[in-house]
């Protein structure tokens, strides 16, 4: 029974190997390899090559997009830097202008204050002169009144009979 199982498992190999069978199987294997190479291997390699080219193109495009993005980023950074410099220049100019205007306003205010002060001094002097003139007038008129009373009194003292 064991012998029958071996024949069944090993087939003809258990009885001996035939040279024609080996050549036939080798020839069929070579034909199979040639057919596989022509109909399976070559198309498979073409597909793999196309896939490789596609992936390489995608990588190249991604690299180009990355370089463009970096270029745009650098341009944006330059624009931002220029914008900041322009802003700083504007702010500095505004500060200078404000300082100049402040100095002009202060100088103008001082000049105006000086003019007002001089006008006030002149007004005070004029009013002082007017007051002095009015005072002289009053003194003169009081002097005349007093003098006339003194003269009248002297006259009445000299003329007791009247």
Curated annotation (Swiss-Prot):
Keyword Transport: yes
Keywords from the named record: ATP synthesis, Cell membrane, CF(0), Hydrogen ion transport, Ion transport, Membrane, Transmembrane, Transmembrane helix, Transport
InterPro entries: ATP_synth_B-like_membr_sf, ATP_synth_b/b'su_bac/chlpt, ATP_synth_F0_bsu_bac, ATP_synthase_B_chain
Membrane topology: Single-pass membrane protein
Cellular component GO terms held in the UniProt record: plasma membrane; proton-transporting ATP synthase complex
Classification via SUPFAM superfamilies: F1F0 ATP synthase subunit B, membrane domain
Main localisation: membrane
Entry GO MF terms: proton-transporting ATP synthase activity, rotational mechanism; proton-transporting ATPase activity, rotational mechanism
Compartments, as annotated in UniProt: Cell membrane
Transmembrane segments: 16-36
Role: F(1)F(0) ATP synthase produces ATP from ADP in the presence of a proton or sodium gradient. F-type ATPases consist of two structural domains, F(1) containing the extramembraneous catalytic core and F(0) containing the membrane proton channel, linked together by a central stalk and a peripheral stalk. During catalysis, ATP synthesis in the catalytic domain of F(1) is coupled via a rotary mechanism of the central stalk subunits to proton translocation. Component of the F(0) channel, it forms part of the peripheral stalk, linking F(1) to F(0).
Assembly behavior: F-type ATPases have 2 components, F(1) - the catalytic core - and F(0) - the membrane proton channel. F(1) has five subunits: alpha(3), beta(3), gamma(1), delta(1), epsilon(1). F(0) has three main subunits: a(1), b(2) and c(10-14). The alpha and beta chains form an alternating ring which encloses part of the gamma chain. F(1) is attached to F(0) by a central stalk formed by the gamma and epsilon chains, while a peripheral stalk is formed by the delta and b chains.
Family membership noted in the UniProt record: Belongs to the ATPase B chain family.
Protein name per the record: ATP synthase subunit b
Protein's organism: Bacillus caldotenax
């Amino acid at each position: 029974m064991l012998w029958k199982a071996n024949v069944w498992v090993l087939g003809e190999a258990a009885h001996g190997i035939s040279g024609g069978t080996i050549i036939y199987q080798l020839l069929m294997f070579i034909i199979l390899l040639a057919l596989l190479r022509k109909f399976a291997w070559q198309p498979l390699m073409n597909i793999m090559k196309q896939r490789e080219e596609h992936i390489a193109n995608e990588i190249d495009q991604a690299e180009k997009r990355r370089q463009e993005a970096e270029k745009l980023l650098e341009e944006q950074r330059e624009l931002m830097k220029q914008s900041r410099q322009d802003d700083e220049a504007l702010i500095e100019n505004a500060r200078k202008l404000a300082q100049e205007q402040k100095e002009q306003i202060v100088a103008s205010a001082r000049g105006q204050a000086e003019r007002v002060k001089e006008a006030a001094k002149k007004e005070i002097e004029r009013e002082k002169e007017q007051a002095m003139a009015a005072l002289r007038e009053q003194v003169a008129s009081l002097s005349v009144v007093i003098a006339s009373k003194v003269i009248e009194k002297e006259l009445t003292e000299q003329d007791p009979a009247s």
